[in-house]
């Protein structure tokens, strides 16, 4: 069991005791707590994208920034054209990104099966959040007109279908890996336990809490450790303090920009609710970030 999964279980145990003590946690408290930890850990894990790939000269750096900003602009155009298409694209990219971040070390030597596995594994996680908390998803969406309208265009039964389909396919793929690629059974069992813990937390906890636990502890923290080890490998004098100092300015700028846009939404300067504009902002950043992390993880798997 990885140290991150152990941390996850410990935090889940603490939160379950908090629920028993107070019977429930208000949605306002959940939102504030989730937002705080996402800003503390989630945003920093993507703040150094521009430093993770080799950019030796001005031309390569310029190409990187044009590509990065171009993907953001393209995604914004998609959301402006259709919120449904933007949401579907966001779920697909997030699913692939989560799966790739977890399973990149499998190194299956078959790109098609590898990419398909990343997508299915990530989808099994994403739809577990929705499947076990569908009533809360509807409640949160109904709190704002634009999110209510967005969800009204989706057949909620589809979440159940995608939940079962993605999980069944993932299990079949794991069995196939043992047979075809000779992946050790104990490694597959470890991944199955990992998924079981995610499903259990999604079943036990509200949507915001189970997602935040996963995103912070099982996704962002491992990524931060990989990034730190990367910089440490390049410079053996690189310290944790250096890493924090390196992340801090980019993270603070990102947080301030997000707060500013949220303020504009709250004061109706931007004609989107805070939840919807938050989803859009996370979506447009996730697209280029997933490309960078994919390339970065490829270098780690070599």
Predicted regions mapped to residue ranges:
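Membrane-water interface signatures at transmembrane helix termini and the short loops
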Residues: 186-226
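Short, hydrophobic transmembrane alpha-helix segments
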Residues: 16-29, 265-269
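Hydrophobic, membrane-inserted alpha-helices
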Residues: 12-17, 67-76, 98, 192-201
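Membrane-interface helix-loop-helix junctions at boundaries between adjacent transmembrane segments
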Residues: 55-62, 66, 73-152
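N-terminal membrane topogenic signal
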Residues: 1-11, 58-62, 244
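Alpha-helical transmembrane segments of multi-pass integral membrane proteins
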Residues: 92, 116-137, 159-177, 193-207, ...
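C-terminal ends of transmembrane helices
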Residues: 44-55, 96-108, 172-184, 227-228, ...
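Alpha-helical transmembrane segments and their membrane-interface exit regions
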Residues: 37-46, 91-103, 216-227, 283-288
């Amino acid at each position: 069991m990885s140290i991150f999964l152990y941390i996850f279980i410990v935090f889940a145990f603490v939160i379950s005791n908090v629920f028993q003590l107070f019977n429930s946690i208000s949605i306002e408290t959940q939102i504030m707590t989730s937002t705080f930890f996402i800003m503390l850990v989630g945003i920093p894990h993507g703040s150094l994208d521009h430093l993770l790939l080799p950019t030796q000269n001005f031309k390569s750096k310029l190409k990187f920034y044009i590509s990065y900003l171009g993907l953001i602009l393209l995604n914004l155009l998609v959301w402006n054209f259709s919120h449904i298409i933007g949401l579907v694209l966001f779920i697909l990219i997030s699913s692939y990104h989560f799966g790739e971040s977890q399973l990149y070390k499998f190194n299956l030597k078959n790109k098609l099966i590898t990419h398909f596995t990343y997508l299915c594994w990530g989808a099994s996680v994403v739809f577990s959040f929705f499947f076990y908390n569908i009533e809360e998803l509807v409640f949160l969406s109904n709190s704002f007109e634009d999110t209510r309208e967005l969800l009204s265009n989706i057949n909620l039964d589809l979440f159940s279908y995608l939940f079962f389909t993605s999980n069944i396919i993932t299990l079949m793929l794991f069995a196939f890996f043992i047979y075809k690629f000779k992946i050790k059974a104990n490694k597959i069992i470890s991944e199955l336990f990992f998924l079981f813990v995610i499903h259990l937390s999604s079943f036990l906890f509200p949507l915001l809490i189970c997602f935040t636990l996963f995103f912070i502890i099982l996704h962002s923290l491992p990524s931060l450790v990989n990034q730190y080890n990367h910089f440490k490998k390049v410079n053996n004098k690189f310290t944790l303090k250096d890493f924090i100092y390196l992340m801090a300015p980019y993270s603070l700028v990102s947080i301030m920009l997000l707060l500013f846009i949220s303020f504009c939404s709250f004061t109706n300067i931007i004609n989107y609710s805070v939840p919807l504009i938050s989803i859009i902002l996370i979506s447009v950043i996730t697209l280029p970030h997933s490309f960078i992390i994919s390339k970065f993880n490829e270098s780690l798997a070599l």
